[in-house]
Amino acid sequence: GEGEAAASEGEGGGEGEGEGGGAAIDPDVAFLTDLGFMEGHLRAGLALYEAGDLSAAKTHMGHPIEEKYEAVAKRLDQLGYGDLREQISALAAAAEAEDSYEKIAEMFGKVRQTHEEVRTNFDAADQLKSFAALTRVAADEYAIAVEGGTLANVKEYHDAWGFMRVIEAEAGELAASDDAKASDAAAAIVEQVEAAGSAFGDLQGQGDYEKDPSILYAAAARMELASLGAE
């Protein structure tokens, strides 16, 4: 989508200074945001695959490599996780081949495990800041999705939905942390994900919900404030 390069400034010397990106975003936060961006596409793809929308699922499974991987490749190599490219490529290929959902889910689990290992190299404060940044990217995508107050672009809606699922899962884990500051900040972020739920219907954007991007932008701002408490 049009807002998809928004969080890449930190890696490639100014790559992707799209809407929603901060010019001074910390390289670690930018990297973590991009990692979440990739996982969000895969989460959306997995849910769509399970729902039987294979065409949309294949599109989302392919996007991490097509749109984002080069922005994180160098850092992943430095951290010793260069094999993530092959893991994600294999997952996308399995989706294209229409393998069983169980196989797809298992492969996604391996990708997520690698993501979790990568995240252990970064402190909680930077992870929390990346959730705020990713919510801002979600808001940019969502604004395109509901332009004119109707569901105009379901692909961008899927993107936003997937990004919020990543934040929900990761902040939920940090909320259980032994670090009281990080735990409290993460719990506040989980609350913002829940509040932003009013901007979403079901996976395909059906149902009664508020088609208002400001809900997500407000959630991002509150997450950013919450993340400062973890420093």
Model-based region annotation:
Residues G1-E231:
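Mature extracytoplasmic or organellar-lumen-exposed domains after removal of signal/transit peptides
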